[in-house]
Amino acid sequence: VQGIRTLTYGGVSVQVVIHMPSASVKDALVLYHPTVWFDDRTLPAAENTLDNFKRLLQRDDMLLVSVAYPQQNREIGEGLREAEAALLWVKNEASRALGLSIGRVFIAGHSQGAYIVTRLNTLHQTDGVIANAPGPLDFEYRCLLEERGNAPGSQECGLMVARHGPASANPAPYRRISLLSFTAGFKADALFVQGVGDSAIQMRSWPLFKQSVQACTDCQRPVFLEVAGGHDALFMSFEAREAFNQFIDQRRSR
């Protein structure tokens, strides 16, 4: 059974796409889509993200909740309010609202969705986090490239320039929301997947991110998997799919 639902938690409303398997549900996987910017694209992105992760899973006994968190006219990370509300609804209200008994709760995301789950892992306890090609890792660098004409312009950097001025003149707000600023305090084990053929911007900062997380002294266990392929490596690589399922299965059986 699959359907769209608007949920509210703590006064924050967000649309989600829910997949309820025919098998008896034991655990939940909350999903976060990549960058789409425009509000009218977030729901299709959430549906697409749900389908992609549903294909990855080797068994159909998890409640899947894909979150259509907003991005339009918001700085990177500002959609965290809605992303967080959906996670807390699944943790605290979904069992009663859906008539299920949910045990463990996992979160997963791709690209900016992986950024979101990594930040959520600093805020809330879950049973495991999967992040594929998380980013932006270094938003200052990304927007500096655009400022210098070395990368095509984006709405995300344009919004920051309008609010804070260019990165060259005021780098602090850009650094503050970069994922490189969120590499400590992880509350759950995390699997980070990265295709080594991803963009030059991503691969420039990936080793710095990996090194910083591995140096963390107050994190649960982070696992890094680098595989052949590009930005969508988790969905294309057999090795990544096996690691994804193993990561979840090991933590479901504890």
Pin down the residues of each PLM region.
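N-terminal cap/lid segment of alpha/beta-hydrolase-fold proteins
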Residues: V1-A23
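Proline/glycine-enriched tight loop/beta-turn segments at coil->beta junctions
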Residues: P21-L29, F186
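Short substrate-entry loop that stabilizes the transition state in hydrolases
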Residues: V25-K26, T35-R74
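C-terminal catalytic histidine-bearing segment of alpha/beta-hydrolase fold enzymes
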Residues: I76, A200, P207-K210, Q214-R254
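Gly/Ser-rich "nucleophile elbow"/oxyanion-hole loop immediately N-terminal to the catalytic nucleophile
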Residues: L88-S111
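Glycine-rich nucleophile elbow surrounding the catalytic serine of serine-hydrolase chemistry
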Residues: G109-R119
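Hydrolase active-site cap/lid region
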Residues: T118-A167
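Short beta-strand/loop motif that positions the catalytic acidic residue
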Residues: F186, F192-Q194
